[in-house]
UniProtKB/Swiss-Prot annotation:
GO terms for cellular component: membrane; peptidoglycan-based cell wall. This is Vesiculogenesis and immune response regulator. The gene is virR. Could be O-mannosylated. Is likely mannosylated on Thr-61 when overexpressed in M.smegmatis. It is found in: Cell inner membrane; Cytoplasm. The keyword Membrane applies. It comes from the Bacteria. The keyword Chloroplast does not apply. It is a peripheral membrane protein. Its main location: membrane. InterPro entries: LytR/CpsA/Psr_C (IPR027381). The lineage of its organism: Bacteria, Bacillati, Actinomycetota, Actinomycetes, Mycobacteriales. Changing residue 59 to A: Does not affect glycosylation; when expressed in M.smegmatis.
Amino acid sequence: MLVTVGSMNERVPDSSGLPLRAMVMVLLFLGVVFLLLVWQALGSSPNSEDDSSAISTMTTTTAAPTSTSVKPAAPRAEVRVYNISGTEGAAARTADRLKAAGFTVTDVGNLSLPDVAATTVYYTEVEGERATADAVGRTLGAAVELRLPELSDQPPGVIVVVTG
C-alpha cells in the first residue's frame, strides 16, 4: 500500500532574503547601468569633442568664404627685463614669472634709470609691442607707458623695469 503525504511539486518558500530571480535581475540591472556609465565616459572624452568641433569649424570656415574674417593675432614682441633697484635677482625673478606666463624674454640684466619709482612696462609704436606690453602689465600688475627717451638706445621690444 502506497501512501502519499504531499505533492512533490510543492515549493517551500525561503523567507531568508530575496528570491534568486530577483537578485539576478538586480545584478543585471546594475551591470547594464555600469556599462552605460563607462560607455558615456569614454564617448565624451575631451579629445573627441575638441576634434569633432575643430573639424566642423574648419569645414564651416572653408565652406563659407563670405563669413566674417577674424583678425589675425598681433605678433608678440620680445620682452627685456631690467633691474633698476638694489634688490639682487629682482629682474631674474620677474623674467621667470613672465616666461612661465608664456612671454619671450630675451634679455635680463641691470639698468640705471633714476626717475622711475615703480615697476613699469615700456613699449614703442612698433606693431605688437602695445598688446604685449598690456599683457605683461596685467601679468605683473604694473603700469604700462610709452618708452622713455632714456630708453631709446635699447633694442626693439617691450622693456620691463623692476624696482624690487
